[in-house]
Amino acid sequence: MGVMINHHFLAFIFGILGNVISFLVFLAPVPTFYRIYKRKSTESFQSLPYQVSLFSCMLWLYYALIKKDAFLLITINSFGCVVETLYIAMFFAYATREKRISAMKLFIAMNVAFFSLILMVTHFVVKTPPLQVSVLGWICVAISVSVFAAPLMIVARVIKTKSVEYMPFTLSFFLTISAVMWFAYGLFLNDICIAIPNVVGFVLGLLQMVLYLVYRNSNEKPEKINSSEQQLKSIVVMSPLGVSEVHPVVTESVDPLSEAVHHEDLSKVTKVEEPSIENGKCYVEATRPETV
């Protein structure tokens, strides 16, 4: 009995630590969305990482609610649902019409339709509570592990370019620590569904830190990339319980005129005609493009 109490106490301690670190992880994109708010444009940012994170938080929150003894899992994923919803709402508000429609389609397909399907299957098809917990837990594991394609892509990019520009050591370190906290939480709760994704997260985080130490003094220049990638770099974020995100972070300032061409309606860009000479005088005419 004493061992069980000790295990629950340790689970509580690691759960608290996991909550603190994950709380900071969820707030990592705040500078991104402050930039979006100030510029009234989503620029080259995408909604996919935030929608995937919201979907993950919804699944883990549902899992924690039916499991009934995972309060610390409820707290962090409730916070995650609120924060990611705010991020997505701001993205909808400032995205172009085309990007907004695309993001809304993804939101309806993944966070409404797919989540509703999982909800109905686990609630109406699977009747017994223990089996519900087991089925939903393995669904969470499968989805959490599957999205590790993103950090693997960043690892491949670092090896290819021999540059750690896209993989800050500090972020990789704290995310690895987060994986350790949640792994220990799952271990002491004897919940393999919580522990497994964080084993993968720990291994990938450790790999990222090793690569950083190997390539941090490399003199290799990153290969040339397109203009949108020059403006932004991809930061891999392991969310609580093994879900990964790619948060774009500004790397350099963008020329206002080129930004207008890339992100704004063409009607906002004036067209300068070639100078003409008439009666010994030079004329330069600025005209707006014709609207259809």
Curated annotation (Swiss-Prot):
Keyword check for Electron transport: no
Topological domain ranges for the Extracellular compartment: 1-8, 67-70, 127-134, 190-193
Gene3D superfamilies on file: 1.20.1280.290
Domain MtN3/slv: 12-99, 135-219
UniProt GO BP: cellular response to abscisic acid stimulus; cellular response to osmotic stress; cellular response to salicylic acid stimulus; embryo development ending in seed dormancy; leaf senescence; seed maturation; sucrose transport
Keyword Lipoprotein set for record: no
Cellular location(s): Cell membrane; Golgi apparatus membrane
Tissue specificity of this protein: Accumulates in leaves during senescence, in a SA-independent manner. Expressed in the lateral roots and in flowers. Expressed in developing seeds.
GO cellular component: Golgi membrane; plasma membrane
Segments in the Cytoplasmic topological domain: 30-45, 92-105, 156-168, 215-292
GO molecular function: sucrose transmembrane transporter activity; sugar transmembrane transporter activity
Induction context: Induced by the pathogenic bacteria P.syringae pv. tomato and the fungal pathogen B.cinerea, as well as by salicylic acid (SA) and abscisic acid (ABA). Induced by osmotic stresses (e.g. cold, high salinity, drought, mannitol, and sorbitol) via an abscisic acid-dependent pathway. Highly induced during senescence. Triggered by NAC072/RD26 during senescence.
Topological category with respect to the lipid bilayer: Multi-pass membrane protein
Superkingdom of origin organism: Eukaryota
InterPro entries: SWEET, SWEET_rpt
Transmembrane segments: 9-29, 46-66, 71-91, 106-126, 135-155, 169-189, 194-214
Entry's family note: Belongs to the SWEET sugar transporter family.
Subunit and partners: Forms heterooligomers with SWEET1, SWEET6, SWEET8, SWEET11 and SWEET17.
Protein name: Bidirectional sugar transporter SWEET15
Protein's organism: Arabidopsis thaliana
